[in-house]
Amino acid sequence: CQYVPHKKLSIKDLDPDFYVFSAHKLYGPSGLGILYMKSKWIDKLEPYQGGGSMIKNVDTDSSTYLNGFQKFEAGTPPIAEVIGLSSSLDFINEVGIDKIYEYEKKLTQYLYDKLIKNNDIKIYGDFSNQTSIISFNIDGIHFNDLSMLLDKKNIAIRTGHHCAQPFMKHFNISGNARVSVGIYNTKDDIDYFINSIDEVKKILKS
């Protein structure tokens, strides 16, 4: 889900059985998800819900479904959301995914260089493989308190276990703060973020 808006992806080279991502992570509308599935799994898996446009025949004791992906598309599709996603993909293609990647890579490096200057900030993961996202904690400050005070400065980050509890257990922590950059961010945004962290530390560590 996190990879798609930041870097070019080749399903042919990756060759996954399944691949998923969300429209809102591509600057599109919320409430829409995309699932790529190899044909062998489409044939093997049963629909998880019923509805119109996916049924061949319904009887009192059985049902038969349409073939292929259609058996998973029950009911009225999210038409407006699909149109919105199409527009966001047009936007990304117009800008160029390679340009987006290079811009975000430089911006993330700038953010990383600023963060590691703080001895009380712990960064998680291998930064050499990072794209756009940095997870961290500040010694002596709970990540939720950090998020709450940054919110008052109109800075939105995510905190908690990020639906990745095994990752948190590996580092023996309950959660962390996660900051991400996008094509709409600038170095001025990064500077404001770092300055705001300094202000939060003064408040919570005083």
Specify the residue positions occupied by each region the protein language model found.
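Pyridoxal 5′-phosphate
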Residues: C1-S206
